[in-house]
Design a protein with these regions (language model features):
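A ligand-binding cleft/hinge motif common to bilobed small-molecule-binding domains
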Residues: 1-10, 78-111
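Periplasmic-binding protein-like
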Residues: 18-26, 51, 93-151, 153-173
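Beta->alpha turn/N-cap motifs
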Residues: 1-4, 20, 28, 48-50, ...
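Acidic, polar ligand-binding/catalytic clefts
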Residues: 1-37, 108
Length: 173
C-alpha cells in the first residue's frame, strides 16, 4: 500500500519495501507530450488511488474521470473515454509492455512514494516483527531475487531494480 499521511491515520505501516511514483499512460499516437498537456484534457483515475488523491488535491481544475477498478480505468482509456490514465508507474509499465500502442509519460505527478505492508492500527508488536523480517530478507537480497524471477520480465527492459525496490525496508525518500 502506498504510504500517505491519510493512510497513516488508519493503519500502522512497516518499513517500506517498494517505491513508486504516479505517472500517466497515453496512447502511443496521442499528442500529449507532458503533464502540462493534461490540464485541458480528461485524465482517468481509479477512485481512492494515490493518483486520484494527488490530482484531486493538487489539480482541482483538471477534468478527472473516475472508475472503481483499475481494469475499468484501463478499458476506458482503451475505448477513448479519456486522454490519459494516471496511476502508480509499476502498474503502467507492466500494462504498457503487455499492450503495445501505449506509452508512459516520463514526468511524475508528485514525488516518489514508499510502498509498505500495513497492519492494524496499534499493533506495534506485529509491525516491529515485520520490520525485523524485512531487514533479514534485505540481507539475503530476497526482493531482488523475486524481482529477477517474476517482475523483471513484466516491466520495460530499462527499468532498474533499485528504482522500485527498497531492499531490507530501507527508504531514501
Amino acid at each position: 500500500m502506498t504510504v500517505t499521511p491519510e493512510r497513516k491515520e488508519a493503519v500502522e505501516f512497516t518499513n517500506p519495501n517498494l517505491k513508486v511514483a504516479v505517472q500517466a499512460l497515453v496512447p502511443q499516437a496521442s499528442t500529449v507530450k507532458n503533464l502540462d498537456d493534461l490540464a485541458t484534457r480528461t485524465t482517468i483515475v481509479t477512485t481512492g488511488t494515490t493518483a486520484d488523491i494527488w490530482l484531486t488535491k493538487n489539480h482541482p481544475d483538471w477534468k478527472l474521470l473516475k472508475f472503481e477498478k483499475n481494469s475499468e480505468s484501463l478499458q476506458a482509456l482503451a475505448n477513448g473515454r479519456g486522454d490519459a490514465y494516471a496511476q502508480d508507474n509499476l502498474v503502467l509499465f507492466s500494462w504498457a509492455k503487455q499492450n503495445p500502442g501505449y506509452r508512459v509519460l516520463t514526468q511524475t505527478l508528485g514525488a516518489e512514494a514508499p510502498i509498505a505492508p500495513a497492519v492494524k492500527k496499534g499493533n506495534i508488536e506485529l509491525r516491529d516483527w515485520v520490520n525485523v523480517e524485512l531487514a533479514k530478507l534485505g540481507e539475503e537480497k530476497f526482493l531482488l531475487k523475486l524481482y529477477d524471477q517474476y517482475v523483471r520480465k513484466e516491466l520495460s527492459d530499462d527499468t532498474k531494480p533499485e528504482s522500485v525496490i527498497g531492499e531490507g525496508g530501507k527508504w531514501q525518500g
